[in-house]
Amino acid sequence: MASVKRPDIYDFSKEAPRHRLERKVYPEVNVSGFSHNDEEVAFFTQVAALLRSGDVVLDFGAGRGEFMENDPSIYRRQMQNFRGRCARVHGCDLDPVVVENPTLDSAEVIEVGKPLPYEDETFDLIVSRYVFEHIADPKWAAGELLRVLKPGGWICAMTPNKWGYVALVSRLVPNRIHARVLSKVQPGRKEMDVFPTTYLLNRPSDVRRHFGHAAEVYHYSTSGVPSYHFGSMALFRLQQLIHRLSPPLFDLGLRFFIRKEDVRGQ
């Protein structure tokens, strides 16, 4: 199928084998740059509904902003980049590379167990992309995120489901070889973007336990476009079938929307 060459929609120079497969399977990618069941577009559409122009936003675990470098979909990049859409975007990460993130107005390197470098009730919105699965101290993370969030503010997090097949297999693979394995399973994935996993905040019950005392916790589960398939069309199709047949308990991803209680009743 011929593709519409629209550099303002889809950047072919950033297309990895997994993106190429997606474009073959889902014709609409050739129209808009993303598929009808794109999990990231769905999540960031929810976030966009919450975002206001005067908001101060924290990107928790912001990393280097790899989506700006690796994602061929212009729309998906725009949805994930909050800079210019709100008052200010702060970012923090354990990795010093966060200071190079082009989507942030300011960046801070943090340490587990130490207070985040922000005053109480600073942020209207906190976004976390695939970070919860790496958190080694959930009590610390939840406490600090709730501390720096304004009353009535939202924490929006996307993370794997602990009982999805990707997380189940991942827990069988030693962290020391995760990067090597993922580069084979998910062609185009760079080693610098792979980190040790803990899966301590990857069930709804885990998130409610750590955040629920001071916040309302909403979530949904999802299994969208396959991405762990070695670049094989056969495996891609097999994973599509698994996604359709699996009950929600075994969906690949979880999306959390956590609203801090507002004692003022607003």
What name fits each language-model region?
Residues 114, 133, 164:
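Active-site micro-motifs of SAM-dependent methyltransferase domains
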